[in-house]
């Protein structure tokens, strides 16, 4: 039985950052100030529904600001772009997340800062909704995105509300400008309960993969969001998801992302996968220190930068067929992380028989370095399972015919 190497790679990344102890817990929320600073987790989910994770992936934590893009998507789905944009603009603020950043029409600058998120929250379930009905609508929808029933940490919400003076002042100003209709306390209560929904990194990976897939749930196949809603949400995440660190993030990491002060961090590569990390210590910008390191390494190693000029492959595994004692795996397109992940998943699921396996690269256009490493590791595991492995590469798209351990693989001519 072949095994998948991706979880091993994720464990290696966690080991690389585990000794990083810089950063501080969020100290303005008592429940978060006393949280365990040590948990560390990472999870990936492809648009095909393949989930990989490592570390403390079963630990629940509150979404906090990570809830903002999902709430924005829900508001867009319910109300439409025109109604949402009448309340909240789409420009980066360049200021801290808890500033009252308004444009010339007194709209919050974007949905990723607190002012914008409070306004977005008030659009969901209609302006005449009660707090509990609105929060339940959000919780239920987030549960659909995660693929399981999520719950609210009401103890933490009460702790957060006790020190919510700044958000209350923002809500009062928004009400004064006619952006929201509810009383300021009710608006902040609703928003705070939204932030207190509990998730794991695996939940967030599935939720983000739904956005990456244009609104189709990667596990259930259910259509939850319109593709245009997902595109708008990812655009805002790219420009404003990391607050006043957004420009630096997009340049160096290149993944639409959103952070939360509980230590969560999510990222989305459109059409490919969703990523989530959890580590509670934060940098001065309010982003997880180890989470940022993990994302930078994933982006570099896996070629995930949104502005990469590498071609993106569709269905990478064209076919797996058998002729006598020989199994042929035919690949196609440009080999990047997602394409090579499809290859690895296919060989793990396939019941190989016979004595030989031939990897046919006749239709392959190019290889990203990460794909070379992943393909070579997959071939090594086929060899170690007792099969003789050959590579058919008439256009020399592979730089060499070595397995991942440095031994030579045979060429098929």
Swiss-Prot record:
The keyword Hydrolase applies. Pfam families: Glutaminase, STAS. It catalyses: L-glutamine + H2O = L-glutamate + NH4(+). Residues 23-307 are annotated as: Glutaminase. Keywords: Hydrolase. GO terms for molecular function: glutaminase activity. Homotetramer. Belongs to the glutaminase family. This is Glutaminase. It comes from Corynebacterium glutamicum (strain ATCC 13032 / DSM 20300 / JCM 1318 / BCRC 11384 / CCUG 27702 / LMG 3730 / NBRC 12168 / NCIMB 10025 / NRRL B-2784 / 534). The gene is glsA.
């Amino acid at each position: 039985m072949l095994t998948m190497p991706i979880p091993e790679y994720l464990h290696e990344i966690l080991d690389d950052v585990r000794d990083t102890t810089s950063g501080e817990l969020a100290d303005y929320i008592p429940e978060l100030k006393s949280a365990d600073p040590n948990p560390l987790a990472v999870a990936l989910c492809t648009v095909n529904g393949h989930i990989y994770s490592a570390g403390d992936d079963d630990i629940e934590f509150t979404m906090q600001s990570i809830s903002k893009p999902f709430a924005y998507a829900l508001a867009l789905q319910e109300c439409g772009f025109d109604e949402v944009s009448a309340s909240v603009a789409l420009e980066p603020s360049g200021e801290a997340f808890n500033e009252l950043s308004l444009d010339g029409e007194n709209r919050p600058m974007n949905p990723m800062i607190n002012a914008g998120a409070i306004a977005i929250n008030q659009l969901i379930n209609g302006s005449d909704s009660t707090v509990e009905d609105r929060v339940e609508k959000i919780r239920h929808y987030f549960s659909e995105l995660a693929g399981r029933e999520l719950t609210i940490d009401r103890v933490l919400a009460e702790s957060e509300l006790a020190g919510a003076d700044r958000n209350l002042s923002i809500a009062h100003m928004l009400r004064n400008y006619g952006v929201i209709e509810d009383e300021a306390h009710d608006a902040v209560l609703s928003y705070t309960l939204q932030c207190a929904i509990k998730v794991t990194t695996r939940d967030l990976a599935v939720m983000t993969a739904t956005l990456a897939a244009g609104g189709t749930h990667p596990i259930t196949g259910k259509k939850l969001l319109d593709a245009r809603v997902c595109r708008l949400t990812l655009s805002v995440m790219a420009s404003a998801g990391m607050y006043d660190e957004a420009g630096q993030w997009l340049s160096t990491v290149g993944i639409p992302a959103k952070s939360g002060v509980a230590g969560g961090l999510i990222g989305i590569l459109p059409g490919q996968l969703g990523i989530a990390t959890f580590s509670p210590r934060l940098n001065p910008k309010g982003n997880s220190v180890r989470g940022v390191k993990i994302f930078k390494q994933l982006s570099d190693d896996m070629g995930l930068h949104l502005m990469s000029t590498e071609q993106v492959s569709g269905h990478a595994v064209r076919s797996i067929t058998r002729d006598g004692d020989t199994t042929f795996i035919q690949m196609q397109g440009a080999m990047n992380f997602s394409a090579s992940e499809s290859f690895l998943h296919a060989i793990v699921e396939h019941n190989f028989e016979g004595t030989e396996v031939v990897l046919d690269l006749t239709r392959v256009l190019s290889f990203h370095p990460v794909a070379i490493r992943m393909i070579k590791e997959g071939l090594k595991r086929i060899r170690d399972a007792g099969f003789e492995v050959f590579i058919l590469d008439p256009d020399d798209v592979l730089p060499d015919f070595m397995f991942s351990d440095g031994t030579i693989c045979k060429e098929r001519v």
